[in-house]
């Protein structure tokens, strides 16, 4: 985390999982909100967040309160990410109910309404199908006004509609083609919601393997894919792989389809040299 600050990178993001989302399920997997608290204390400049909090893991009022405290601890550097959740094996392992996708999205909509209300109003009363609050205060409020930026994760119509209503950013995992499709959906949903599409940033989350040579980068990518239990796609879809100049060209393709924010997925184990290449040779070359 300190290296992110030292290199001048804009932000660092974690994932919200109860088990490793690939490989053996007994590997290390750190709790998200606890990790954010540590990030708040060991960084001074970089922003940080979760891509994204799974809505069914925690009651929305508890998530709102914990996130507000992290924003306080960091002096207003929290990026708040939230989504419907998808990793069924984690729910089963921990004895949590795993609703169908329609219910998860309905819960997501209610949860965002609750969280924004708790952050911005003195007290909140909410009577929803899934959540109920009764004259609930939340103190202290987040530092950021009116509240921390909200990122909603997903590429379908339901997430686009929610992003158009509530979010500062819509994040999509995958290729430039997938990002382009998500941007078209976001534009239509913003029009329906009476909101300027410029108010909602489109973010992409490709995996990344960058090295001084193409051969070494491909070697890193294959190793990362194997660790994730995946097959590296023949066309490299959803990956940034190559030398710094090649990485710049691949990232520009995202910009061409409306992406203005990229969260690069680093592999395991952590590679400090890759991070330095990003900071010193890739990001300065992006227009």
Each model region followed by its residue ranges:
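Active-site-adjacent structural elements that line small-molecule/cofactor binding pockets in enzymes
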Residues: 1-287
């Amino acid at each position: 985390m300190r290296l992110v600050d030292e290199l001048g990178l804009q932000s660092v993001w974690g994932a919200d999982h109860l088990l490793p989302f690939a490989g053996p399920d007994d590997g290390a997997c750190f709790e998200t909100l606890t990790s954010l608290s540590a990030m708040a204390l060991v960084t001074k400049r970089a922003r940080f967040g979760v891509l994204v909090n799974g809505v069914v893991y925690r009651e929305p009022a508890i998530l709102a309160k914990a996130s507000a405290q992290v924003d306080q601890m960091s002096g207003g550097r929290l990026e708040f990410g939230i989504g419907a959740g998808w990793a069924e094996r984690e729910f089963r392992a921990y004895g949590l109910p795993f609703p169908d996708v329609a219910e998860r999205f309905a819960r997501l909509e209610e949860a965002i309404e609750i969280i924004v209300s708790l952050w911005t109003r003195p007290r909140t009363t909410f009577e929803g199908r899934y959540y109920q609050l009764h004259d609930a205060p939340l103190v202290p409020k987040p530092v950021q006004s009116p509240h921390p930026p909200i990122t909603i994760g997903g590429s379908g119509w339901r997430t686009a509609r929610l992003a158009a209503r509530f979010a500062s950013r819509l994040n999509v995992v995958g290729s430039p083609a997938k990002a382009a499709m998500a941007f078209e959906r976001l534009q239509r949903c913003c029009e329906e919601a009476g909101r300027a599409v410029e108010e909602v940033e489109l973010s992409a989350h490709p995996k990344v393997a960058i090295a001084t040579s193409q051969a070494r980068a491909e070697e890193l990518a294959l190793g990362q894919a194997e660790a994730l239990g995946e097959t590296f796609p023949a066309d490299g879809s959803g990956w940034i792989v190559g030398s710094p100049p090649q990485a710049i060209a691949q990232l520009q393709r995202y910009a061409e389809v409306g992406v203005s924010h990229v969260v690069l997925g680093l592999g395991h184990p952590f590679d400090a040299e890759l991070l330095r290449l990003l900071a010193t040779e890739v990001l300065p070359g992006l227009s």
